[in-house]
Regions:
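Secretory targeting signals
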Residues: 123-182, 188
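Hydrophobic/aromatic residues in alpha-helical transmembrane segments
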Residues: 87-91, 139, 171, 284
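Aromatic- and glycine-rich beta-strand/loop motifs that create alpha-glucan
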Residues: 1-32, 283, 288-293
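Helix-loop-helix units of permease transmembrane domains in multi-pass membrane transporters
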Residues: 14, 94-126, 130
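Terminal transmembrane helical anchor/hairpin motif
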Residues: 50-52, 198-279
Length: 294
């Protein structure tokens, strides 16, 4: 059976991306230096917290474990933000750039089917994201080990990062397939599409609060509404899931009241964005097939 690596590198678009980005040591070094600059900040803040703890100020933080968690959670959230913002821009010129350079027609008349072109462009865009995640991941692992973070939390963080990278790269790729120039694709992605995905959940949470407060609904219904609205933004899904887990609930279902459970936002997030990824990639393939028929 052919390995995944051989299937990927057999795609000429992916092979070309790997060949040109082997010089990516400069990129890796840049991210590594950025994280080195970030580490002293965390360590300094951790030392400050440890000093405060030694003064018996009754702060609710442990020393070494709190320092590890102080590294793990902010670093994971920052990486999630970086992936969310950088993923579309790495894919937004994938197809629009070919149209702008008038090389897309040459690509379409090759023996590569449309789905192989889209897959190759997707993997090419994910290479840089893979570099970024790989550079930061050791710091996250150190924070998880020192902070005694549960394995299920590390698993959820990994799934959130992976699905976010795929979904938001697919968003950029879909917009790129519908645009004629890189400028148009970038403006459409960061001016309309991305705000709809990122700001929409906050507006949904605000709307849920106003509606349920107006009809005098109880806290349980409000919690259900907030949890569901928070499930469509990577940051709110991660934070609300952590808060629910920290309150003593499981990582699949959280108990709001005795015998009443609510599904964790991260599960809804994964399901929704996995579907969005499949849908947008399918639409991008259809778009290329339509252009090939013209």
């Amino acid at each position: 059976m052919e390995s995944i690596w051989n299937r990927l590198t057999r795609n000429p678009i992916v092979a070309n991306a790997f060949r040109h980005r082997r010089v990516g040591w400069q990129l890796i070094a840049a991210f590594f230096l950025a994280m080195l600059a970030y580490c002293p900040t965390l360590m300094g803040a951790g030392s400050f917290l440890t000093t405060l703890l030694s003064l018996d100020l009754d702060l609710p933080l442990g020393s070494l474990s709190a320092l590890g968690q102080f590294i793990f959670y902010p670093t994971t959230l920052i990486l999630l933000v970086l992936v969310t913002l950088f993923a579309p821009v790495l894919a937004v010129g994938a197809i629009a750039g070919e149209r702008q350079r008038q090389t897309l027609s040459l690509l379409l008349i090759t023996l590569l089917p449309a789905h192989s072109i889209v897959r190759g462009k997707l993997v090419s865009a994910l290479i840089y994201l893979g570099f970024m995640i790989a550079v930061v991941w050791p710091l996250i692992l150190v924070g998880a080990v020192v902070g005694r973070v549960d394995a299920v939390e590390l698993l959820v963080a990994t799934l959130l990062l992976g699905v976010t990278a795929l979904a938001f790269t697919s968003i950029g790729l879909f917009v790129s397939s519908r645009s004629k120039t890189i400028t148009n694709a970038t403006m459409l992605t960061y001016g309309v599409v991305l705000p709809a995905f990122l700001i929409g959940p906050f507006l949904g949470m605000l709307l849920v609060t106003i509606i349920l407060a107006g009809v005098g609904s109880g806290d349980d219904l409000l919690a259900y509404g907030w949890s569901f609205a928070a499930s469509f933004n990577p940051l709110t899904a991660a934070i609300v899931s952590y808060v629910m887990y920290d309150d003593g609930g499981g990582f699949i279902l959280a108990e709001t009241t005795p015998d009443q459970y609510i599904l964790h936002p991260w599960l809804i997030y994964l399901g929704f964005y996995a579907f969005i990824t499949w849908l947008l990639l399918h639409l991008a393939v259809r778009r290329l097939e339509e252009m090939n028929e013209v």
